[in-house]
Amino acid sequence: MSFFLGQILEKMGSIDKDIRFMATHDLANELEKDTFKMDPTYENKIVTKLLALTADSANNVQENVVKCLGLLIKRVKDSQATEIIDTLSKNILEESNKEELVEISGIGLKTIITNLPSEGSSISTLVIKNLVPKLLIGIDSEKLKDKNEIKMSCLDILNDLLQKYGSFMIGDLENIQKVVLPKLNATRPAIRKRAILCLANIAFPSPDNLFNSLLDYIIKSIEEAKKPDHISTLIQAIGAICKSSGYRLGKYLPKVMPHVLNYCDNNKFEQNDELRENCLLCFEAIIEKCQKDVTPYIGEIITLCTKYIKFDPNYSDDGEGEEDGDEEEEEMETSGDNDEEQEEEEEEEDLSDDDDISWKIRRSSCKTLCAIISTRPELLVELYQKVAPVLYNRFKEREENVRLDIFTTFVLLLKQLNKKLANPQAKEVLKQQVPKLVQSISKSLIDKSIRTRVGAIALLKELVMIIPGSLTGQVSQIVNGINLSLSEKNTNSNLKIEALVLLKLLLINEPAQSFQSHITSLSTHIVKCINDSYYRIASEALRVCQEFVIVFNKIRSSTDCKPIISNLFAANFVQLKAQDIDQEVKEAAISSIGTIITLFGNEIQSELQPCLSILLERLDNELTRVVTVKVLSRIINSSINIDLSSILPSAIKLLSTFLRKNNRVLKQSSLIALNDIVKVCPNLLPSSLLTGILTEMATLINESDLQITHLAFVFIQNLLKNYSEKHQAATLVNEKCIPPTLALLKSSLLQGVALESLLSLFATIVQLDEPGMKYEQLLTLLFNTAADIKQPVTRQSFHSISQCIAVITVNTTPALRKQTIHNLICNLSSVNEPLVLLSLSCLGEIGRRIDIHENENLQESVYKTFEANNEEIKQVAALCLGDIAVCSLQSYLPFILEQIKNQPKKQYLLLHTLRETIVKLSHTDEGIKTIHPFLQSILPLLFDNCVNEEEGTRNIVAECLGKLSMIEPNEIIPKLVEKIKSPSPLERSTIVTSIKFSIMENKEVVDQYLAPNISQFLSLLHDGDLIVRRSALLSLNYIAHNKPNLIRNDLSVYLPILYNNAKIKPELIREVDLGPFKHKVDDGIEIRKTAFECMYTLLDTSIDKIDVAPFIVSLCDGLKDTQYDIKLLCHLMIIRLANSNGAALLENITLLLEPLRVILMTKVNETAVKQQIERNEECIRSALRAVASISRIPNSDSIVKFEEFVKNTIRTTPLAAQFNSILSEDTMSNQDSMDTSN
């Protein structure tokens, strides 16, 4: 290294500039290597030489020198580093006449700052210490007061330092601020601009007192300012400070906003466009960063934006005043406009377009409106009423960039309607505006500018998707514009693609009749685009063709449609048979031609067979088989009855092989296609392939993919129903498919559509009565399968088998059915508990399907099992009796009600029975009709049991009341409301719980009868009894989760109640004397936990109605709670809030930092048991996830206190590794997936 450095030093002194260049270049390359080590003997010489070369006459040498100094600063001793800083600073401050040296020295210092480590280090501290005083001299020195270039260079360097090390420069910030603030008055705009950037970077890390003094100075300056340039600079400074410091500016808005609003619309300065633009940009920053505090001013800002988005004094549109009916606009259109540096001219004198900067004002208005649209979902209806018309009337904007911004703003407004909590009224307002909107945008569809057309199409695409079916009357206008884009020669490819996508969306979403007059022109353009050489245009055109054919099929009349279809088919066929085309085109061609064959196959008979042959080839191709299978299904199901005999046997053979492929989509599609074949054309299924198909089908019957299993069962059922050789099919099904089916019945995972299709299959099998699968044989197999289930057996173990037994029994002959029921009844007296459980389950499943009350000893035998020793048997017996009553209500319900009255020991089980009956009957109109006459007998009994001491019993009663209340709401809901005033807290608790079970019933009934009374039920949130209050909180949480619209408009009432219940109440903490020691019992834990669960739910369903500030105050209470569960719940709420309304969370983040710090620093006692240690570790991990979610919020790094919290509490502690691991996780892994709906 010494030899190398010696050579480099020698070459750097060469008189040949090329040698000097190569020497500095080689040195820079070496310095970039991690292995480079500076030789102490050469260090001083190298530094000295490099500093001397900053004045080199060759620019490329200077550039290399700057690079070397930036890399060298970290590798030299402090004394040499100081020399580098001092020399470069001296070049700037003392060599002011040498402009090139000043410039290169400034670049050198900026390069050094860039190369310094980001974290505070000794070298960084040294550079800051040496450089800041010199920069301040350069900015403020009297000697350099006329040297603007030096001031700008120093401000640039200082800004870089503040940006990178602001939080490490706290001690210097006050001096820097004192020096930089006066530069806001500088005569040169470039100096003012750099001063603003510096002040914004000072504001970010500055302590509160310094930040306050900065804002006080600026506000006072605005109040005293007279010149528009000075005012404009101060307002620009406020905007910049707001962007860097966010919510900290919020408390100053009452002092700031009146001035900004005034100057934005002040007639005195109406000729100063820059001032107006800066006001609007300031609004944008404030709206984004101070969402809560800016609320009182939003209305005025909207008014100003809608006014100045039309501000175009150099251009007069005579029709605009009439169209908008806006007098203000007419005034603005006749006003004059002055450049900022010119003297004030006469008002009537217009400027040339070259001097016109009014477009900046219109563009700034767009940006501010975008900020409002993005951050104020609660104003969506108002925005559509007030802003949308202004926007679409400005689609004629003459400046293209502004016009595109207006399009973007309107698209953003449209996208708000897709948000979960968007007010549906806004969509209705938009629908009324569609005619004018489309009329305005249609002009842009035929604009000469490609960018304008693409922007207009993007807007229309969004509109079609937001309000599908609402553009019926405007389709012609849009289609005319699409036709123009598709027909023009040399049209931009992107424009064609976008036009095709829009056409596809229109065809999918708008009524077919809307396209009646455009069929011929559209078909011509589609064919042309299908033949386009660019694969993206061709593939999109094929997708459009598919939708076009569907629309054409709906509106074709007796007129000859063959020419159009033939042309489309021919274009599709060319792409279908082509071998050397893109995969995207291949798939689109297969899908499109499949649709043509499906709907118009009779019109192209002569071309059909060659096409089907190619489709068979595509089916055998690994790349195209999935889409071809789907197309084959469509063709099979065609109403035209396409002759597929030439390809179907080969296709079936291929489909059967696909069933074993490790491709779920292919497997699923193949099963659907095989199903379609056995339904539509079973005779084309060769018997020779049946064994292979059913062998493959048997492998699909398992618990690993129940959707595939469901399709397999459906295929087997359709095969047995439709195949001509039923005996052969039944024999193979029995041999291949019944064994895996019986094995699946042992799985507790079998449920949903797979179970339903299996039950349907068993019903079909029994009705066929084929040898080997007769009723008695199936029954034996099912009972044997049940016997094979491992102990211990529960009712869930027999859930599927009992339903299968019930289905085959219901579908067999009456004689066999009666015998089976008799045997099941006899089994109830067995000592074999699993057999008793299975028999009870079977009787219940049979009884809820058909009336079996006439079977001897049924009621007595089932009721006797209520006395069994096994609790599981008693529970199943209760459900069995309830199920039997479903179809035998007249016979069984009076008995059940009588026993509830007279058998207190069996009352709990009998109430389960009653609930089972009510639940099953309330799901169908017929069931409701059946139970209605018994309401007068049931209700008194339920009301009597509302005061039962057992909470489980009261919950059953509440469910019954809730279900019944929706059967006869007129009568029952008033009775429930009356019971709210009951003196019994247990009865009040039961009544408020009942509404949980009401709200999931018929929506119309809930809205008509329950909604008007919901506030009366929830008045029990104020109840003095803890049990009642918790029941009310649980009901509120359930409503918030499932029917939030019932309470959304009253959250201002319910949220304070939740916040109050979330606090630790000393009066609910009691001391229990346990002899040797005393123990504190907190009776309010469950209340608090339920309140927080409800708050968590509301964050998901009603966040737009929540004022975040008091919500966070309550969150702080939760973070300080003594219960781990509540702390974990609060962490989840922070995560959910960070994801859904991060800006509002940041405005109040400082409240959360101390409680989070306490949690993260918590250590368990040395005597703590393992469970306590694990719970504390879990709580810390959860808190770290919450902090990580906050750190992911955009601009969270601008919150100084949060950054300091992360640094001091996490980054510099043993928690750092764990926190970094959480940060590196995918954001989705931190989703708050907890379900708190009770």
UniProtKB/Swiss-Prot annotation:
Placement of HEAT repeats on the sequence: 41-78, 126-167, 171-208, 210-247, 251-292, 382-419, 432-469, 603-641, 646-683, 688-725, 853-890, 933-966, 967-1004, 1008-1045
What is the source species?
Answer: Dictyostelium discoideum
Keywords from the UniProt entry: Nucleus, Repeat, Ubl conjugation pathway
Cross-referenced InterPro entries: ARM-like, ARM-type_fold, CAND1/CAND2, TATA-bd_TIP120, TOG
Regarding protein family, the annotation reads:
Belongs to the CAND family.
Q: Which SUPFAM superfamilies match?
A: ARM repeat (SSF48371)
Q: Where in the cell is it found?
A: Nucleus
Residue ranges for the region (Disordered) are 315-354
Role noted for this protein: Key assembly factor of SCF (SKP1-CUL1-F-box protein) E3 ubiquitin ligase complexes that promotes the exchange of the substrate-recognition F-box subunit in SCF complexes, thereby playing a key role in the cellular repertoire of SCF complexes. Acts as a F-box protein exchange factor.
**Could you name the domain of life of the organism this protein comes from?**
Eukaryota
- Name its GO BP terms in alphabetical order: protein ubiquitination; SCF complex assembly
What protein does this entry describe?
Answer: Cullin-associated NEDD8-dissociated protein 1
A GO term from the CC aspect: ubiquitin ligase complex
